[in-house]
Amino acid sequence: MAVRCCSSMASASVVLFFVVVGMSASMVSGCDRCVRRSKAGFRDSSIALNAGSCGYGSLAASFNGGHLAAASPALFRGGVGCGACFQVRCKDGKLCSTAGAKVVVTDEARSTNRTDLVLSAAAYAAMARPGMAAQLRTRRAVDVEYKRVPCEYAAGRNLSIRVEEKSRPPRELSIRFLYQGGQTDIVAVDVATVGSSNWKFMTRDYGPAWSTAQAPAGPLQFRVVVTGGYDGKWVWADGEVLPRRWTAGRVYDAGVQIADVAQEGCYPCDTQEWK
């Protein structure tokens, strides 16, 4: 998968349209780089986070060592926030380290009880100083500060596409993006037969899930617009991502990992450095 400039005025217009859409979604939560202050709680069982609103299912357990989180509606952004990463640290210096824990959003916390994030038990314990995890868990919620950070996966772990079970080859294709790196949002997805310039747009179903009822014949390549703040660009595969006979329920490697960090045009909402 490569990053390229658009080759025609028509393509440029499409990019502009989707960048504007992406800006609207991103502006809901303000500046990603800002340090925010709130409370964070935790869930004793990670099952709810694995089976959360983002629809990752059992695959969520492979995200970030199981350090997962449910996010408030403002951070979840109607599903656009699925897969986003946040660095979270509690403000009790006796119990918690200054490093905190990095979490991946897999669910929405609809009833937040004034908490912006509800962490998995493993992530909550990871905020603690050595030997203090048990004591930290006796407090169901703590004051925290957090900010969005780039997602980083192990070397060799690329952006991947899961073909959802509701897909019906060859025309009805529903996919879900997994392991998205960087600090951007995917705001547009196109699919085409490998070697063809006849791209078909896909519609966002919810969060990381996209679909089309007019999938072209395989093998298939994809291109996406990644954006956040005011910056956006196409990222796409030069070769095959899904084979000619793709299969529902399988995960396919996109052959690339996104490492971009979105540029923002907003005034810093917090001048305190993250130390």
Curated annotation (Swiss-Prot):
Classification via SMART domains: DPBB_1
Superkingdom of source: Eukaryota
Pfam families according to UniProt: DPBB_1, Expansin_C
Signal sequence interval, chain numbering: 1-30
Record GO biological process: plant-type cell wall loosening
Expression triggers: Down-regulated by gibberellin (GA3).
Major localization listed first in the record, in broad terms: secreted
Keyword Glycoprotein: yes
Domain Expansin-like CBD: 171-254
Sequence ranges assigned to domain Expansin-like EG45 in this UniProt record: 51-156
InterPro entries, per the entry: Expan_Lol_pI (IPR007118), Expansin/allergen_DPBB_dom (IPR007112), Expansin_CBD (IPR007117), Expansin_CBD_sf (IPR036749), RlpA-like_DPBB (IPR009009), RlpA-like_sf (IPR036908)
Localization per record: Secreted
Signal in keyword set: yes
GO cellular component: extracellular region
Sites where a glycan is attached: N113, N158
Keyword terms: Glycoprotein, Secreted, Signal
Family listed: Belongs to the expansin family. Expansin-like A subfamily.
Protein name as it appears in the record: Expansin-like A2
Organism of provenance: Oryza sativa subsp. japonica
Gene: EXLA2
